[in-house]
Amino acid sequence: MTAQLIDGKAIAANLRQQIAQRVTERRQQGLRVPGLAVILVGTDPASQVYVAHKRKDCEEVGFLSQAYDLPAETSQDDLLALIDRLNDDPAIDGILVQLPLPAHLDASLLLERIHPDKDVDGFHPYNIGRLAQRMPLLRPCTPKGIMTLLASTGADLYGMDAVVVGASNIVGRPMALELLLGGCTVTVTHRFTRDLADHVSRADLVVVAAGKPGLVKGEWIKEGAIVIDVGINRQADGRLVGDVEYEVAAQRASWITPVPGGVGPMTRACLLENTLHAAEHLHD
């Protein structure tokens, strides 16, 4: 069996097109365009690239985009004051603080300061709590994007054994909640898990988000399973690889996401989708 590719790039492009169309309709109806504020602290090269992509995405769909590029020594109090101002700004529907932050800043405190209805990353405890209570409002972007990718395969998730490799607050934990909502029986593995191979080999669906290249061996993948690889790791030769041993896994899986071009584009598209949702359903 050779797996079919889940083309995140194409699915994300289609989603951006739909969002741009809706923004055009809003303009024609005399409604304001959605607004996204992006806060970048310091000069981390990867963060600068991510933020540049997000601004380009906003431009493409016609959003108002406000950029706050702040020096690395910016204080916690100054950042909190900026977030407060953006919370009160009626032109802004979403506030994004680019992670990671410099060591002297408390990311949890800053993310919790964002009003839940402007938390378009979906990281606020209120939004995670709503997802856990089966009443999602603004959903974490990567898990939300993965659910869209899974829907594109036409696979029926009800009753599937799903394994999430990695238990981060950004992907693993909310991913487990999304899969529960989708009708899966979910196992979350983490650094204390014994015999990872055994868990993975029994899974109908594997979502890997550990940040370790080649952690999940291709031979562990059950024949016909769906494989979603969230990992993006740069090798010494400059190549980008995922957390799954792709070549072998692709011979066993029914569907698999490539790296790059799988999950990453959907995360960005879902940030736009959340911002549009906030504008239309939470702020208009």
Swiss-Prot record:
GO cellular component, one term: cytosol
GO molecular function, one term: methenyltetrahydrofolate cyclohydrolase activity
Binding site for NADP(+): G166, A167, S168, I232
GO biological process: L-histidine biosynthetic process; methionine biosynthetic process; purine nucleotide biosynthetic process; tetrahydrofolate interconversion
Domain of life: Bacteria
Pathway connected to this protein: One-carbon metabolism; tetrahydrofolate interconversion
Keyword set, alphabetical order: Amino-acid biosynthesis, Histidine biosynthesis, Hydrolase, Methionine biosynthesis, Multifunctional enzyme, NADP, One-carbon metabolism, Oxidoreductase, Purine biosynthesis
Pfam families: THF_DHG_CYH, THF_DHG_CYH_C
Gene3D superfamilies (alphabetical): Leucine Dehydrogenase, chain A, domain 1 (3.40.50.10860), NAD(P)-binding Rossmann-like Domain (3.40.50.720)
InterPro entries: Aminoacid_DH-like_N_sf, NAD(P)-bd_dom_sf, THF_DH/CycHdrlase, THF_DH/CycHdrlase_cat_dom, THF_DH/CycHdrlase_CS, THF_DH/CycHdrlase_NAD-bd_dom
Catalytic activity annotation: (6R)-5,10-methylene-5,6,7,8-tetrahydrofolate + NADP(+) = (6R)-5,10-methenyltetrahydrofolate + NADPH; (6R)-5,10-methenyltetrahydrofolate + H2O = (6R)-10-formyltetrahydrofolate + H(+)
Signal sequence range: none
Keyword Amino-acid biosynthesis assigned: yes
NCBIfam families: PRK10792.1 (NF008058), PRK14186.1 (NF010783)
Family, per entry: Belongs to the tetrahydrofolate dehydrogenase/cyclohydrolase family.
Subunit structure: Homodimer.
Function: Catalyzes the oxidation of 5,10-methylenetetrahydrofolate to 5,10-methenyltetrahydrofolate and then the hydrolysis of 5,10-methenyltetrahydrofolate to 10-formyltetrahydrofolate.
Protein name per the record: Bifunctional protein FolD
